[in-house]
Amino acid sequence: MPLNIEDKKAVVAEVSAQVAKAQTIVVAEYRGITVGDLTKLRATARTQGVYLRVLKNTLARRAVEGTPFAGLAEQMTGPLIYGISEDAVSSAKVLNDFAKTNDKLVLRAGSYNGNVLDAGAVKALASIPSRDELIAQLLGVMQAPVSGFARLLAAVAAKKAEGAPAEAEAPAA
């Protein structure tokens, strides 16, 4: 059923609102994917905070017009699914991970920070840890010396409680 002009304006407004908040847009060709697989992809995207939508390319071009993602308009041909995310790597990760398990989804292009990315650059972007993962790694690195020192103090306290002289442990390098 074709959309009337009011429906088209509503779709463009909805997608434009998502694009305004986005850091990354990834475009992939979905030709030949079953409805069940597409439903799984949508569920995964939803849990990762990625806005995933199949759009008419003309409506998508209008939604990105006048934004840092306008350069992506040249890549908008054929049956495409659009992944839009506020996180820099989420949409690339979701679509790239799905493309690894389903060869019918082909990454076409993306846009990040005002730059248009080819499929290889989108895959490279997907390999970068997310902000939350980076914070967790940083906290782990910062916490390691403190937890080692706490274990050392606990060992010294245990030795003293036993009545044996405590041996100094060599500091970890």
Curated annotation (Swiss-Prot):
GO terms for molecular function: large ribosomal subunit rRNA binding; structural constituent of ribosome. PROSITE patterns: RIBOSOMAL_L10. Pfam families: Ribosomal_L10. Keywords: Ribonucleoprotein, Ribosomal protein, RNA-binding, rRNA-binding. InterPro entries: Ribosomal_uL10 (IPR001790), Ribosomal_uL10-like_sf (IPR043141), Ribosomal_uL10_bac (IPR022973), Ribosomal_uL10_bac_type (IPR047865), Ribosomal_uL10_CS_bac (IPR002363). Forms part of the ribosomal stalk, playing a central role in the interaction of the ribosome with GTP-bound translation factors. This is Large ribosomal subunit protein uL10. It comes from Cupriavidus metallidurans (strain ATCC 43123 / DSM 2839 / NBRC 102507 / CH34). The gene is rplJ.
